[in-house]
Design a protein with these regions (language model features):
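Conserved, mostly hydrophobic/aromatic
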Residues: 15, 46, 54, 99, ...
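Glycine-rich, proline-tolerant flexible connector loops at the mouths of alpha/beta enzymes
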Residues: 53-69, 172-182
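Conserved beta-strand positions in the central sheet of alpha/beta enzyme cores
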Residues: 55-58, 85, 108-109, 132, ...
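Alpha-helix-loop-beta-strand connector modules within alpha/beta enzyme cores
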Residues: 65-85, 123-135, 183-202, 207-208
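Glycine/small-residue-rich loop that forms an oxyanion/phosphate-binding "nest" at active or ligand-binding sites
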Residues: 68-123
Length: 247
């Protein structure tokens, strides 16, 4: 997903669980709310509101490693013109290929970027500028496996190791703010951006339109987009208004 002009991309989030569109709080599967039984219907609602991009996560894939929810992604690609950024359970090259083949624009790799360097580097090499990294941060540590584990790996060391790869973006999520609507953790974003030249996407904590206004005013050259989830579903943010702000 390439930067379009100077405006930020708004990525409404669709989290997939058991074939439905849900939201979690802080990644806790026990705190799951179903917002739409049909991910395709939800995607069409977003498309009708003017967005061009979707951020989709397969929660079942992230936790169990299965790939059932790919059917929903195929339906969205066939029936809308939305560009899709997709992650969750992407742990081998066959899955990356399958996602690219069904039209996913940007494949997100999380856990495997930290645990299987060979696979990750091969994915980036095979699909330059189509792979993003999910950098999920939980109390200054890297969280993996559906945020159930933290890695004994310094964020700075990891960022150095990927600096020369042709990566699309780093998706920076504050796990503790995800679904909490507590506002964006700007300090965390800045701590990551100062250590890398790679484009970044902000995620976690967006609560209302003022968060987007502040993010836009900060004019970070590296922030290419922002992921918004619960605040849209709970109607704290109107997408049409949000799109005007980021442009």
């Amino acid at each position: 997903l390439s930067r379009v002009g100077t405006f930020m991309i708004i990525f409404p989030a669709i989290d997939l669980k058991d074939g439905k569109c849900v939201r979690l709080i802080q990644g806790d599967f026990k705190q799951s709310t179903t917002y739409n039984e049909s991910p395709l219907e939800q995607a069409k609602i977003f498309e009708d509101s003017g967005v061009e991009y979707l951020h989709c996560v397969d929660l079942d894939g992230a936790l169990k490693g299965n790939f059932e929810n790919i059917k929903s992604i195929e339906q969205i690609k066939k029936n809308t013109n939305l560009k899709i950024q997709f992650g969750g359970g992407v742990r081998n090259i066959e899955r990356v290929e399958r996602l690219i083949n069904i039209g996913v624009n940007n494949v997100i790799i999380g856990t495997s970027a930290f645990e299987n360097k060979t696979f990750f580097e091969k994915s980036v090499c095979n699909y330059p500028n189509r792979i993003s990294i999910a950098l999920d941060i939980k109390q200054n540590q890297i969280a993996t496996k559906g945020w159930k584990e933290v890695k004994d790996l310094q964020i700075s060391d990891f960022l150095k190791s990927i600096e020369d790869l042709n990566i699309n973006s780093i998706i920076i999520t504050d796990v503790m703010r995800d679904g909490m609507k507590q506002g964006i953790n700007f300090e965390m974003l800045e701590n990551v951006m100062v250590q890398t030249k790679i484009d970044c996407v902000a995620s976690g904590g967006v609560s209302n339109i003022s968060d987007l206004i502040i993010l836009k005013k900060k004019n970070y050259s590296q922030i290419k987009g922002v992921i918004v989830g619960k605040a849209i579903y709970d109607k704290n943010i109107d997408i049409a208004e949000a799109l005007k702000i980021v442009r």
